[in-house]
Design a protein with these regions (language model features):
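Class I SAM-dependent methyltransferase Rossmann-like catalytic core
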Residues: 1-28, 32
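Class I SAM-dependent methyltransferase SAM/SAH-binding core
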Residues: 37, 41-88
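A short SAM/SAH-binding and catalytic strip from SAM-dependent methyltransferases
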Residues: 87-88, 93, 97-127, 133
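Short "lid" loop at the C-terminus of a central beta-strand within the Rossmann-like core
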Residues: 116-119, 148-152
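Short alpha-helix
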Residues: 169-193
Length: 222
């Protein structure tokens, strides 16, 4: 179900951001495609480890941003900011004054693209979009990315995608081979680009990894 996929995305986000904050020393995040706030947002996870962590949230939905502004607050030492912008226009995101006001792009950043890549059609040139964002970041930055896929259960994924498209929301699942290029030039962190639920799973994880129709990976910019 869609709920299963969303819950799995949120769990992957938590594991990845915890790893980056605790083990990789990342203290600032750019989260694009934020979605409606719920428990375990990027700043919740990061600031639990390092209260000074700064987060800039980006979403193209004004309703999402209204909710986010109302519900998501940073700490005194770790500001949180929000901008309305479209992932398909990465240059506009990077040039927004809120980026310079919240993040120091001369220092490593965690770029979070979870549950958003499938909204990009191939003619949006998603590889260029990711590359443009990564190119703007300092060496030592990280990309956290998920991508829905038909590889595990083609029929179920087709049904989910059709339901999404019917509601006017693009949903483009991609194979492993079509997802790998998003990480071009980056160093994948173990265990690599894998079924999302199997990326450093929590010890008590009971979910069948193949019931989550997505790949997930974390990679470092050298």
């Amino acid at each position: 179900t869609i709920r299963t996929q969303v819950r799995a995305q949120r769990a992957f986000l938590g594991r990845a951001v915890r790893y980056l904050t605790r083990d990789a020393g990342i203290r600032q995040y750019l989260d694009i495609g934020t979605g409606i706030p719920s428990a375990g947002n990027v700043h919740d996870v990061a600031q639990e480890v390092a209260p000074q962590s700064r987060v800039l949230y980006v979403d193209n939905d004004p309703i999402v941003l209204a909710h986010a502004r109302a519900l998501m607050a940073g700490t005194a030492e770790g500001p949180v900011a929000f901008i309305q912008a479209d992932l398909r226009e990465p240059e506009a995101i990077l040039s927004d004054p809120a980026v310079a006001g919240t993040l120091d792009l001369a220092q490593p950043v965690g770029l979070v693209l979870i549950g958003v890549m499938h909204h990009l059609r191939d003619d949006d040139d998603p590889r260029r979009i990711v590359a443009t964002l990564v190119d703007a970041l300092a060496p030592g930055s990280y990309l956290v990315l998920s991508q829905s896929t038909p590889d595990f259960d083609p029929d179920a994924m087709r049904a989910l995608a059709a339901a999404s498209e019917q509601g006017g929301i693009p949903n483009v699942p991609r194979s492993l081979a079509d997802t790998e290029p998003f990480f071009a030039g980056l160093e994948l962190v173990e265990p690599g680009l894998v079924p999302m639920a199997t990326w450093r799973p929590d010890p008590d994880a009971e979910q069948d990894p193949r019931s989550v129709y997505a790949y997930g990976g974390v990679a470092r910019k050298p």
